[in-house]
Design a protein with these regions (language model features):
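Short, hinge-like loop/turn segments at secondary-structure boundaries
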Residues: 51-55, 84-85, 126-129
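Generic structural signal for small/hydrophobic residues in well-ordered secondary structure
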Residues: 5-6, 44, 77, 102
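Histidine- and aromatic-rich ligand-binding microenvironments
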Residues: 5, 37, 90-92, 113-114, ...
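Acidic, PIN/NYN-like endoribonuclease modules and their adjacent C-terminal/linker elements
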Residues: 1, 99-129
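Short, well-structured N-terminal submotif of metal-dependent ribonuclease cores
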Residues: 1-36, 46-59
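A general structural signal for well-ordered alpha-helical segments in protein cores
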Residues: 22, 37, 41, 54-57, ...
């Protein structure tokens, strides 16, 4: 499983998005490994402006598996946030929650967002991130 973060979806959906990121997302989709979580879905819907983007989102909802955010995910997110803060690293809470979701489900996280690199620098590679 590869949890695709909003940052990578944005590159994938834009004609001028980073070609390497677009290729990684495309490969995950073609292999059937791509998934998302409720936070990513919300962020994408929040940015969907026109009819075309909304149509794409409805299609994504139909075909892309969603990783649940459970009570365990929330506890893990709180621990990741605590570890980051203790190390002097401040990252958005939504990114911490997405990282926790990937870790809980054993999914690799596909992203184009430096904040996930900061989280990894604190917590290491114990589980995919």
């Amino acid at each position: 499983m590869i949890l695709i973060d909003t940052s990578s979806w944005i590159h994938f959906l834009r004609a001028d998005g980073d070609a390497i990121v677009r290729q990684r997302v495309d490969a995950a989709l073609r292999s059937g490994a791509a998934c998302w979580c409720p936070v990513v879905r919300l962020e994408l819907w929040n940015g969907a402006a026109g009819a075309r983007e909304k149509k794409v989102m409805r299609e994504f909802e139909r075909v892309i598996p969603e990783l649940a955010i459970s009570a365990i995910t929330w506890r893990l997110a709180c621990e990741l946030a605590r570890l980051c803060r203790a190390a002097g690293v401040t990252v958005p809470a939504t990114d911490v929650l997405i990282a926790a979701c990937a870790r809980e489900h054993g999914a690799r996280l596909e992203h184009a967002d430096h904040d996930f690199d900061l989280i990894r620098s604190v917590v290491g590679d114990e589980a995919p991130l």
